[in-house]
């Protein structure tokens, strides 16, 4: 990553999914610290919502399982991306079209590509089989995982070429 003194410099990161589920997720942090998340994914279940989270580690030694829990540096309960009570890694759900593709952009003000506490570089990005209930379920697991189900695809988030 090249460094610049310009306040207009944007920091970019990428996660590349290979396998049955393919594509990229590009993260771009602007000078205000807001991160734009651009999805370009295929091979997902058609017309479905898949739980989508940043996990603690970018460790793929045991596929997606070694990425451990959701990234949660403040020790909060699971929630939705717009909730004040949420893991930093709680990005909500990926919405797919009739072909199983997800191609759109959304923003998040909690994750960061710089600094230390909320920095997601080197962490795991996981797509789950089921819909994330955003911590609103009636069982204890809802406040931990959102009942998003099995991990069906994962990638490591790394700095992107400028």
Positions of PLM-derived features:
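N-terminal leader/targeting pre-sequences
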Residues: 1-162
């Amino acid at each position: 990553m090249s460094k610049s003194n310009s306040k207009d410099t944007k920091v970019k990161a990428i996660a590349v999914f290979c396998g049955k589920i393919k594509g990229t997720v590009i993260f771009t942090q602007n000078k205000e610290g807001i991160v734009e998340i651009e999805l370009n994914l295929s091979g997902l279940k058609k017309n479905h919502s898949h739980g989508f989270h940043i996990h603690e580690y970018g460790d793929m030694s045991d596929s997606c399982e070694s990425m451990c829990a959701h990234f949660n540096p403040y020790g909060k309960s699971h929630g939705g991306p717009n909730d004040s009570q949420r893991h930093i890694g709680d990005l909500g759900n990926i919405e797919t079209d009739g072909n199983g593709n997800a191609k759109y952009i959304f923003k998040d003000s909690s994750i960061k590509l710089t600094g230390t506490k909320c920095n997601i570089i080197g962490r795991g990005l996981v797509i789950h089989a089921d819909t994330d209930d955003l911590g609103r379920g009636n069982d204890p697991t809802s406040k931990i995982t959102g009942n998003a189900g099995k991990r069906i695809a994962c990638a490591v988030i790394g700095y992107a070429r400028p």
